[in-house]
Amino acid sequence: MKLLPEKKNLTVVVNDIRNAVWLEDHTDFNVYILGGLVRRGYHYTTLPTRNEFLGMINIDKGFFSCNGFSVERGITAPDFETAKSVREILDVCCASYLMSDSSKLGTVTFAQIADLGYVNGLIVDTEIEKEDFDSIVAMTDIILAE
């Protein structure tokens, strides 16, 4: 996110309250926050009212994170509500990118968001093992972040 202030004329949609505040403080973007229930301790919204909003928009490029991902089980979240919420956002993205550090590779949590091949790319640190890189690049593009 820290590279975003270099961009101009963006409209950003987030469900994370802290990200919305950071974007408000550091950019001149139009920032929309998806409404709904604030998940206690995690500072993001989920469920009811945002569904209507999501049905009305198209997101050019969506960036999201997860609790774990693997070639076999895909992208996962700690609970069903979070997985469903992220999947609904992905469904309105023209292109979507998973941002994760390599330490989450091989971690599988409770609920699947999507298969790795469902996203257009994985943005990951350079610590990813070559064997893992080769397995994942067969499913989706990989962008190495320094």
Give the positions of each predicted feature.
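Active-site catalytic pocket residues across diverse enzymes, especially alpha/beta-hydrolases
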Residues: L3-K8, L23, T27
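Short active-site oxyanion
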Residues: E6-V12, V119-G121
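Conserved phosphate- and dinucleotide-binding cores of soluble alpha/beta proteins
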Residues: I17-E146
